[in-house]
From Swiss-Prot:
This is SCO1 protein homolog. A lipid is attached at residue 19 (S-diacylglycerol cysteine). Keywords: Cell membrane, Chaperone, Copper, Lipoprotein, Membrane, Metal-binding, Palmitate, Signal. It comes from Bacillus subtilis (strain 168). Residues 1-18 form the signal peptide. A lipid is attached at residue 19 (N-palmitoyl cysteine). It holds the Pfam family SCO1-SenC. Monomer. It is a lipid-anchor. InterPro entries: SCO1/SenC, Thioredoxin-like_sf, Thioredoxin_domain. Belongs to the SCO1/2 family. The gene is ypmQ. Residues 26-191 form the Thioredoxin domain.
Amino acid sequence: MKVIKGLTAGLIFLFLCACGGQQIKDPLNYEVEPFTFQNQDGKNVSLESLKGEVWLADFIFTNCETICPPMTAHMTDLQKKLKAENIDVRIISFSVDPENDKPKQLKKFAANYPLSFDNWDFLTGYSQSEIEEFALKSFKAIVKKPEGEDQVIHQSSFYLVGPDGKVLKDYNGVENTPYDDIISDVKSASTLK
């Protein structure tokens, strides 16, 4: 009788683990601040409009001479890999140079990459101080445009945001981007919907 109870308990445990999917290991759980910004087509994108969706975020700018081109290339590769696996995820690129990055400029920048706007929005429509504060509060990310400079200091991470608007993980977006880990975590986050 004890053996049957033990086996039953073990089977129930295995069943629950299999049904629950994988968990995000050590989630960051940063709360994304409410926002409403403009995308490359001049349309509003907000935290509210992303509610219930899993999304990836990064910080870039169109005049970037260093890390933004490889970051955008890697995010483009990631977009293709996610689409190949039929994984539903949005991509949000926040401009860290909003004074220069108007919607038209963002669209022109994106045209340099074989990406799709189907699920990718490049955002602007805020002041420099607003994006610096938003990045710090929401993503614990530093964004700073030194006075008199045309380059902006910013994080090079990709961020996974869950359907509840919390940042779950961050990943290197420049070197050795962990595509398989990101895809696995996106799948896990999708079970939280």
